[in-house]
């Protein structure tokens, strides 16, 4: 009977990708199978995120809940950014943990577990071995028609509030051909949509074969779009400071590039953006969007926002709200600033009361919600191209898919539509999802 692994993932799409790779590595090396039932697991892994406040405490809280399973011989591991940040401190506080590993050493997980068994003591490896992990990962196992592909690791921007450069290291790009081979392999398995991942994908600089040539992100997009079977290309996350004209032009020449862009702005005040060390102004950010929408007028935008950064005044906040209203976002993520240990912003004086920050956040979120509702309503009666991903969560007799702009659509249809592209007329619109009717010849409604 195969051993089973339970993986709990926190945070971003990079962590989701890394969790899939942990599963692939363990399956290839030890035959592990995934389980959603923690009580039947032989190995429990927490793939952690350190971006938000109290991330470390959440990890130790989860560890405490599974400590009793050690009596059954269950192994426990902590990976991800909290592991990278805390390292040996995790073992000191939770000595029942067997392995601690960072985002760049997940490929060594089988060796760490073997060393734990051989030496009889916890193992820690949170080093930064450049891009080595991609050389040791087995071919991806995929289910469904969409997949993530990591094209680079780390970030070299060192925004004043962000812990990512310290937990994932500086920017390192995968070789150009390696990315193309992985995408082609996924296409051979039936994948129609790929999401290219990185902390800052538009900083991609991949070596091309044995030459001295370097491929930038726009070049990578061009080549990925030529791979047979791939019908949609997404990417996340990009940085406004490196959104080149070549990348903007790609929206005119690459129809497979979806009509959705997540471009984190963080704030709308130039003074706050400078304190954040973002490297651009609100006007420069909006200029990029104007250029993009000149090419794709209906381009759906999403973003990240931080409210209550140290020193934020009411005037700063009003400038943020102006930017939000000027752009018109279709879904976004917004948070109250939380200081991350070891970052420059953690040492900034902050005299804004929490109640004021909360009120500002609520105002921002209400405005963003209004924008989402208006955009949803504008979709009524339109025909949208949907990638059907599976059955709907609330009703297994219905199907669920996504539009190019990443909006969930519920529809009726036979299970054979799963994994297919279908045209759907939108008949209902709510804030977070749409409902539609299939228009193609495959429209055989399930009985």
UniProtKB/Swiss-Prot annotation:
Q: What reaction gets catalysed by this protein?
A: N(6)-dimethylallyladenosine(37) in tRNA + (sulfur carrier)-SH + AH2 + 2 S-adenosyl-L-methionine = 2-methylsulfanyl-N(6)-dimethylallyladenosine(37) in tRNA + (sulfur carrier)-H + 5'-deoxyadenosine + L-methionine + A + S-adenosyl-L-homocysteine + 2 H(+)
InterPro entries assigned: Elp3/MiaA/NifB-like_rSAM, Methylthiotransferase, Methylthiotransferase_CS, Methylthiotransferase_N, Methylthiotransferase_N_sf, MiaB_methiolase, rSAM, rSAM_horseshoe
Q: What is its EC number?
A: 2.8.4.3
Its Gene Ontology cellular component terms are: cytosol
Q: Which top-rank group of organisms is this from? A: Bacteria
Q: Which residues are involved in binding [4Fe-4S] cluster 2? A: 155, 159, 162
List each coiled-coil range: none
Read off the CDD domains from this record: Radical_SAM
Residues holding [4Fe-4S] cluster 1: 12, 49, 81
Annotated keywords: 4Fe-4S, Cytoplasm, Iron, Iron-sulfur, Metal-binding, S-adenosyl-L-methionine, Transferase, tRNA processing
Which leading EC class covers this enzyme? transferase
> Which NCBIfam families does the UniProt entry name for this protein?
miaB-methiolase, MiaB/RimO family radical SAM methylthiotransferase
Please report which protein family the annotation says this sequence is part of.
Belongs to the methylthiotransferase family. MiaB subfamily.
Q: How does it assemble?
A: Monomer.
| Name the UniProt record assigns to this protein | tRNA-2-methylthio-N(6)-dimethylallyladenosine synthase
